[in-house]
Amino acid sequence: MGGCHHERVPCSVLVVDDDAAFRQLATRVLTGWGHVVVGEAGTVAEALECATQVRPQAALVDVGLPDGDGFALAERLAALPWAVRVVLISADADCAAARSAEQVGARGLLPKEQLSSQELRRLLENG
């Protein structure tokens, strides 16, 4: 008999990025992993409105949004009663930004190039 097969439970994810093409790519990656993208947003305001309507379990949030800061949004999402698991993404992630991500309650911060990485999958799925 083979080893133990761990069934991954799909989670509902909100994708927040001002680049529609990136949101589309993220949606393809996440649904390919078996997750359900329950909403997309291009701004902080849209993300907060969407989050209260669809109550996602997790969110993939860009650091740079046109109407605000992804770190502040991450803090607000993580503080919601159902405690959204937030992973921040950035075109130019560095160590200082990664520390800031953890301080606001995010699971971590990854460069956008690592969208399809196992690290992102681990951060989103480990509730």
Task: Provide a role label for each language-model segment.
Residues A72, A93-L110, Q114, Q118-R122:
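Alpha4 helix (beta4-alpha4-beta5 surface) of REC/receiver domains from two-component response regulators
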Residues D62, S90:
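Active-site residues of response regulator receiver
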Residues T43, D69-A72:
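Acidic catalytic/metal-coordinating carboxylates
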Residues A20-G39:
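Two-component/phosphorelay signaling modules centered on CheY-like receiver
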Residues F71-W82:
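Short amphipathic alpha-helix used as the core "switch/output" element in two-component signaling
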Residues E40-A58:
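Acidic, metal-coordinating helix/loop segments flanking the phosphotransfer/catalytic sites
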Residues M1-S12, S117-G127:
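Non-catalytic signal-transmission and effector/linker regions of two-component phosphorelay proteins
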Residues P66:
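The feature encodes the CheY-like receiver
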